[in-house]
Amino acid sequence: MASLEVDQKYLGKLAKTVEADNPLLASILFKILGLSINLSAHTVKARKQRRLEHTSRPNQSLELYLHIIWLAREGALLLEQYVIPMVGLYVELKVLAYKLRASFYHIFVQFHNHPPVTKWDLSTPETQATATVPGLAPQRIDKGKGIAKDDDLDPVPSSEGGPVGPPPGFGPESPAAFLMPAVDYLPHAHNYFKEAVAIADQLLWGSHSLRLSVKTEYAAFLYECVHDAEASRTVAKNTIGEVYDATEGIDNDMFNDACTLVAILGKMMKRGLGSNNTAEATGTDNGAAPPGMI
């Protein structure tokens, strides 16, 4: 969560900075800050809850997942419609806006991608098996033998027919499809991260908090969503090198941010490596984020 904490700190600071000249932009930034704080708490809860469950037991917290996707959707819309078109004159805000857009799409990839690429995705078969619309009774799972029927319901005679399943080749629709289309968000998210990295490299020095925030989340994205452990470790390693090579002066606050994020990047350099520093299965997702990340 350290990367998010840096983003939230700059959101508040930059919103106050532009408030006098552009009150509309400031109000939108404060709204995004509120969304980001709520989204951070929800994603942490979802990840912890998923890790606590047995691997064979699907996550049943549909409302939590729907809220996560809704918050990310609203944040992305505010950025694309109001913030990004107005950030041309603000260096730090431009980097932050493009980074946050990538972050919101990172959420879509984690929780609402089709096909699923993480264990937290709503559209995984296990999650869909127990996903229910709030207010309706959930289906009961008969210990892996199929969906159990209520004992007090009479079976439907075959002559009268019954519920019609989807045609062959068409699986059940994602429970969150009414919020966001169930499509592959991975290419879009990857391109947005590349764009944010390029802008950060162009406008900010190597030890700047926002540049480190961009690189830290990009490394996490490469590992847990793209499943490219080697690329993730390379980004982490190169970013640490850029910090040590930077000659620009920084204040105490930025120094503390740099120390925290470099420590996280140091751990990310070792993700996917065995005890003898040999690569394990590429990009294996064990359901846990690196320390300091959601």
Q: Where in this protein do the model-derived segments appear?
A:
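Histidine/cysteine- and/or acidic
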Residues: K145, Y244-L261
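N-terminal alpha-helical interaction modules that lie
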Residues: M1-N191, E195, D257, I264-I294
